[in-house]
């Protein structure tokens, strides 16, 4: 079980992006950018963040060694933020554009903070290369989400 949770949370692009793309094709409502945004909220940002939360809460020793960190109480704050983002993303899957946009802002702020922290740790030699790979994957997912929301809004504005 730990290997599955570890793989899901460390490789979000490899695992969840193909699932999200296939799922977006089979969604029947909305434009293509809307379907892509909803699928991204459901899989990498919803289920992926819940897997990251489970890893932080239940497998903290393995998580800390993977990231090169000492065990500390701060990890539980990260786990709660992962839980919040995961739940908000699952809700965004079925909610309005405004709710999706608010959830995307939450994702950008939270994951952007993680990105900056890991980059600084990596540059200081405190984090292994594996944790740096996840930054690129998360950055790609954030850019894909931003693009899908922009095109969703443009399509929506064109219909009004």
Predicted regions and their residues:
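Membrane-water interface at the C-terminal end of transmembrane alpha helices
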Residues: 22-25, 89-92, 142-160
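Individual transmembrane alpha-helices with interfacial aromatic-anchor signatures
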Residues: 6-9, 130-142
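Hydrophobic transmembrane alpha-helical segments in integral membrane proteins
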Residues: 1-21
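Membrane-helix boundary connector in multi-pass membrane proteins
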Residues: 93-103, 115-133
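Short juxtamembrane and helix-loop transition motifs at transmembrane-helix boundaries
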Residues: 3-6, 37-41, 61-71
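Membrane-interface helix-boundary motifs at transmembrane edges
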Residues: 27-41, 94-100, 127-128, 158-159
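Hydrophobic alpha-helical membrane segments
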Residues: 81-85, 103-119, 139-145
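Core segments of alpha-helical transmembrane spans in multipass integral membrane proteins
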Residues: 43-57, 73-90
